[in-house]
Structures are given as structure tokens and as C-alpha cells.
Design a protein with these regions (language model features):
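Active-site-proximal, Lys/Arg-enriched surface segment
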Residues: 22-103, 108, 113-114
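An internal, acidic/charged active-site-proximal segment
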Residues: 110-210
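Short, basic interhelical loop/turn and adjoining N-cap
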Residues: 4-16
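Short, well-ordered coil loops that connect the C-terminus of an alpha-helix to the N-terminus
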Residues: 7-8, 42, 90, 144
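Short, conserved catalytic/metal-binding motifs centered on acidic residues
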Residues: 1-3, 45-57, 84, 148-154, ...
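Catalytic cores of large soluble enzymes that bind and process phosphate-bearing ligands
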Residues: 6, 24, 123
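Charged, flexible boundary elements
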Residues: 13-35, 127-133
Length: 210
């Protein structure tokens, strides 16, 4: 909150504005992205996809569950959001973020109602599907870029990688140790990891590229 704003409790006022006031979140984000793109967007821009975890103590925050928490480096009670960032040689900034809802929430309508989760946000989506939707939204607004970078949590997903290829996007994804590398000739929709560590006498490569 602006330091000169005359309110008794600025932090509480901000929480009330964000959580209870009526305002168009998507319109605000669209305006923010347009402002940042005007200054920093480049054709060589890179989209970065990753999890953002928010440690929590209770059980009432939307989407909270016990899972690996990157912020703490261990399994803990936390929220998990899919985030998309944009990077160029001159700048790096967040584009969008959406909470991931695990089955423990989606299978409990009463819990969703109590937390005030809108009906349109109750879809059963993988994190990869959420990431693709966030990418589509940013690119539909004209943000340039043809390369996506993602961690292993996304790189292990064939539908996610295929979705990127179908959109004409190249990608660099970390992979799980149990995966091999993709054949260079693999086609969209039929790509399968191939472990060639035995052929090379060493460990399999740990990145997937297309």
C-alpha cells in the first residue's frame, strides 16, 4: 500500500481489497502484461514455467495439501501455483499464476464452497494443462517468444510437451532420472523417451529438447 495512504492498518486494508472487494483480476493482469511488454518484450523472449509453493500452517487456504514444497525443500503443508515468467536479455518478470487444485479439494464440493472457489475454477486440470492455458493467454495478447523452459515436473508430461510442439514452441525441459531422451525424429503425439545411456557408456542426458 502507498505509505501516505491514510488507513489505520495498511496490511489489513490490502488483504480486504484483494480478497473481498469487487475488481477484475484478469483486466488488471492484462494491463500489467501490456505495460511490461511495451518496455521489455523481444522476439527472442523466453517463457519460463515452474511451480511456486506457499507454505501454510492450516487447512483452509484454497488448494492447500501436503506435498513437496520447493520453498522449504521438503514435504510440507503448502499451496502450489503454476507460474509463467518471461525473460529477455534485459529483464525478467512474472506473467501469470494460477493455483493448482489437488483431488482432495476437487472431490469435496463442500470444502470448495466454504473457501469460495468459483465454479469456473473447479475444473480438474493437470499442472501442465494449466501452464498451457496461461501461455495461450499471454501469447494471445501479442507477447512474442518461441522458446519455453520448464522443470522436470512438467518435462515428464508427454501431453504438455506435445501441447508446446502443437503451438510451434521449442522447449528445453529437465526430466526425471527414469526418463531417457527423445528421439530427434519423434513426431508430435508419438514422442517417447529413449534411454541410450548403455550405448554411450555413461548416464542418460537429463534434458528434453525439441
Amino acid at each position: 500500500m502507498p505509505p501516505d495512504l491514510d488507513v489505520a492498518d495498511p496490511e489489513q486494508a490490502l488483504q480486504q481489497f484483494l480478497g473481498q472487494s469487487t475488481w477484475n483480476e484478469r483486466a488488471a493482469l492484462k494491463r500489467y502484461r501490456a505495460m511490461m511488454a511495451k518496455q521489455f518484450a523481444r522476439r527472442s523472449g523466453i517463457f519460463i514455467i515452474d511451480d511456486t509453493t506457499l507454505p501454510k500452517q492450516g487447512t483452509h487456504s484454497v488448494g492447500v495439501a501436503r506435498r513437496h514444497c520447493g520453498a522449504l525443500g521438503k514435504v510440507a503443508n503448502c499451496q502450489c501455483a503454476v507460474s509463467v515468467h518471461y525473460a529477455t536479455a534485459k529483464a525478467h518478470f512474472p506473467l501469470d499464476m494460477r493455483l493448482f487444485l489437488p483431488n482432495s479439494w476437487l472431490d469435496d464440493p463442500a470444502r470448495l464452497d466454504k473457501a469460495g472457489v468459483p465454479e469456473e475454477e473447479r475444473r480438474r486440470l493437470s499442472k501442465g494443462r494449466i501452464a498451457l492455458e496461461l501461455l495461450d493467454r499471454a501469447r494471445a495478447e501479442g507477447l512474442p517468444g518461441r522458446i519455453v523452459v520448464a522443470d522436470a515436473g512438467y518435462g515428464v508430461s508427454g501431453p504438455f510437451r506435445d501441447g508446446l510442439a502443437q503451438r510451434g514452441l521449442s522447449y528445453i525441459c529437465r526430466r526425471d532420472r527414469r526418463q531417457g531422451r527423445l528421439r530427434p525424429e519423434a513426431r508430435v503425439g508419438s514422442a517417447r523417451p529413449v534411454d541410450r545411456s548403455a550405448e554411450t557408456g555413461g548416464r542418460a542426458r537429463r534434458r528434453l529438447r525439441r
